Curated annotation (Swiss-Prot):
Stored InterPro entries: Alpha/beta_knot_MTases, RlmH-like, tRNA_m1G_MTases_N
Subunit structure: Homodimer.
The protein's name: Ribosomal RNA large subunit methyltransferase H
Assigned EC number: 2.1.1.177
Gene: rlmH
Cystines in this chain: none
Role played: Specifically methylates the pseudouridine at position 1915 (m3Psi1915) in 23S rRNA.
Top EC group: transferase
NCBIfam families: PRK00103.1-3 (NF000985), tRNA_RlmH_YbeA (TIGR00246)
GO molecular function: rRNA (pseudouridine-N3-)-methyltransferase activity
UniProt organism field: Desulfitobacterium hafniense (strain Y51)
PANTHER family, per database record: METHYLTRANSFERASE, RIBOSOMAL RNA LARGE SUBUNIT METHYLTRANSFERASE H
Localization terms from the record: Cytoplasm
Length: 160
């Protein structure tokens, strides 16, 4: 069974998002082993110098990369990444399985983005959209797309 990890900066505080995440985690349990890890976000004042922004991204980046093994396939959610359609994402996940990738890690960075080291470690950079979304909401959206991909892959009704 495929192991999927979601590593994200920050805590989810909104109850409605936590409920949605729990629901999709439950639905996904029939298809994958899911692990979700929250990384503490680096405290920062509202106005930061460019050097301070890089320092924050570097510290968060170290924490993001800490638990990622060398064999894991890493997908970074990134505004500058490439977009998928849902069927294309499902096919991409199927291709990973065919290549023998049994562990896939998705990274959701902090509000300032991610460090260069995190970008270098990413095997793929995926953009959901050119729009900006709240990072806690991205976790729910990511889980829904993973669930949709699993259903498409199995030929089960869900995607319309």
């Amino acid at each position: 069974m495929l192991q999927i990890k979601i590593v994200a900066v920050g805590k989810i505080r909104e109850r409605f998002l936590m409920e949605g995440i729990k629901e999709y985690a439950k639905r996904l349990s029939a298809y994958i082993r899911l692990e979700m890890t929250e990384i503490a976000d680096e405290p920062c004042p509202e106005r930061l110098s460019a050097a301070d922004e890089e320092r924050v991204k570097d510290r968060e980046g170290e924490r993001l990369l800490k638990g990622i093994g060398p064999q894991e396939h890493v997908i970074l959610l990134d505004l500058q990444g490439k977009e998928f359609t849902s069927p294309d994402f499902s096919e991409y996940m199927d291709d990973l399985a065919l290549m023998g990738k049994s562990s896939v890690t998705f990274i959701i960075g902090g509000s300032l983005g991610v460090s260069g080291e995190v970008r270098k470690r990413a095997d793929y950079r995926w953009s959901f959209s050119r729009l900006t979304f709240p990072h806690p909401l991205m976790r729910l959206m990511l889980l829904e797309q993973i669930y949709r991909a699993m259903r498409i892959s199995k030929g089960e009704p869900y995607h319309k």
